[in-house]
Amino acid sequence: MTLMACVICLGLQAQTSLGVHPKYVVLITIDGLRAEMVDDPLMPSPFLKMMSQEGLRISKVIGVPPAASYPSHTTLVTGEVPARHRVFYNRPFLWNKDTARISYWYADSIAVPTIWQRAHERGLKTASLFWPTSTNSPYIDYNVPEFWSLDYSCDQMEYIKPSCTPLGILDELEQNACGKLDTITYQAGSLQRDGRTAAMANYLMNHYQPRLTTIHLITTDYSQHALGTQSQQLLQDMASADHAVGTIIENLRLTHRLDSTVVIVTGDHGFCDYSQTLSPNVWLTKAGMLSPQPGGEWKACFYAGGNTCFLYLRKGNDRKTLRRVRQMLDSLPNDQRRLFRIVEKEELVEKGADPAVVLALEPIVGVAMTNNRTGEVVEQRRGGTHGFLSGQDATTLIAYGAGISPARQDVIRQTAIAPWILQLLGID
């Protein structure tokens, strides 16, 4: 953890009553949570508004490069940037091979200790539901990971059962907590999903009493990608996510554990609307530096991991190709060049990006990056995106419960959250 992260962590600790170590910590992520989704009076988020008023509220949480689900969720449980924890994107860059739909699913991708590991090694029980990069973690006692088959025609919930811990736990949850899960009752993006996840969490907390529980609520991500940040669908999804959080709070109250629990709600990233897409690999393909399809000859390739395009060279020290790329970027017409800034290696290292990246392109707000290699460089299209380097898509944080006094703080870095959770649990 960096010195700055230590300082910020001390600031978070100051918001907790001195000497208070709650017995339980629950970390909930609402995928794509923005501050406006809590603060806007038109947003149907009464539970989050109540928690924000009565607990600790951090207006802005600045994420890691890129601000995307898998690297960000891994930072939340490690306190480290991608350069250290080694989960760089949602899907790994496979050096001009077809990435298909492979993601950083497995916990052994993480190169540093997690809060699950630290808690488990101290003899504390842990639980997790649908957390990215948690599959096969030996440190999560009760685990239903985010994992899926590349064969979308299969029964996805049956597919993941052998990867759940302990074996049979998902059957137990279906029988006693959430009902049968299938493509209708638990479809990604469905309004039913977050509520059923909350029911599973409540069952695990009631019956097994894990000291640390991590929960990923995903529905709000889908509507924002498809429709942007102002849709009616998002209002419905936000109400669903808020209700899921509310049922967890209610369950803690009814089981007399709210006064011994800290509940932290945050996002992995925020969102920004876009009206144009930009495809930098089209330039490389036209210049003969990249094959039109994955698997061919190449010298350079941009990878849109989130909404920043990271440049990889087939030979990392190929200065000639790097000069060609720079010359290509410098010669672009103004109507294309104005859509992005060049991020140099020094800034990428400082922010903790993949060390193999030689430079990156960060678009202006209103533009979304793609990995397309052919077609138009710029297209008119609308939706929502995230994955900036400069914090335009920051998320927010609320902490509520035992020892948490009403307080406001403007900004923290995402790397400060995991050390604070360990401090709450009394783990040095």
Map each language-model feature to its residues.
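Structural recognition of the beta-strand scaffold that forms the well-ordered cores
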Residues: 26-29, 36, 58-62, 75, ...
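A long, amphipathic alpha-helix that forms part
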Residues: 18-20, 36, 191-215, 220-261, ...
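His/Asp/Glu-rich, glycine-adjacent segments
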Residues: 81-228
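Short, structured active-site-proximal loop/turn typified by the sulfatase FGly-forming signature C/S-X-P-X-R
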Residues: 36-84, 125-128
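Bacterial Sec-dependent N-terminal signal peptides
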Residues: 1-21
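Mature N-terminal segment immediately following signal peptide/propeptide cleavage
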Residues: 18-38, 49, 57
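Active-site neighborhoods of enzymes that stabilize oxyanions during catalysis
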Residues: 112, 297-424
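Metal-dependent active-site segment of extracytoplasmic phospho-/sulfohydrolases and closely related
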Residues: 27, 47, 240-283, 397, ...
